[in-house]
């Protein structure tokens, strides 16, 4: 009889664990743990501007939140929310699929590429690029010119799409084969040349994929990748650090450049790669499935502090 009772108890414990009736169950009465990117982040800029809290895009003072978690990259945000059942943050839509997080409906609209293109999902921003206004040698300048042309081809656009970039690939877009003869540098051996890429961590995966593919089309040119945030884009190509040891030949930003103030880039040296969206995200165990602009503002300004005020 004792053996039967013991086996029954063990079975009940096991079943309870499978059913989630332990203390691992999501408790909506728990405190909300808020995460944000650092103040130099383009994703942060796009998020707070998008929800109508633009005063917080470069300043933590408007965020009246105890225990605010600040992370330095898209990857750090993903890891933080994956390890915090009660956390909420925001990431690039291009990173959502492989993140292991739940992307919340925003203003009742699912975060999908289709909904971005049709204009119903509105928490969006551009992925932008900037190049140097002058180079250390003509070869680098010619390689960058060829790379910019590659971005407008069917192959380049398809790669951006495959990495989560939102844009149309048209049959009228040129193929690389149809334009490569215009860029003689690509037919040379460029294996002793290194192009320095950097900037936004949200754009890093896309930029690396584009560089890997273009290297094969451009005489095996090398690319060095160093991504620490959108603020590096102007600073290390045309700004204060353009001649430092950490200079960049081409850089990427997940926000628009401040052309009328601190980032007065030379005309013709910057542009847009594609559209991206920003997605509010929570842990998979969180029962919240959608969020509004007003709710996000109230969370990040300390008005809402418990999950049961949202769910």
Walk through the language-model features, giving the residues of each.
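Bacterial N-terminal signal peptides that target proteins for export
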Residues: 1-8
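Alpha-helical transmembrane segments
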Residues: 11-15
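C-terminal motif of bacterial Sec signal peptides marking the signal peptidase cleavage site
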Residues: 16-20
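Exported/periplasmic ABC-transporter solute-binding proteins
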Residues: 21-311
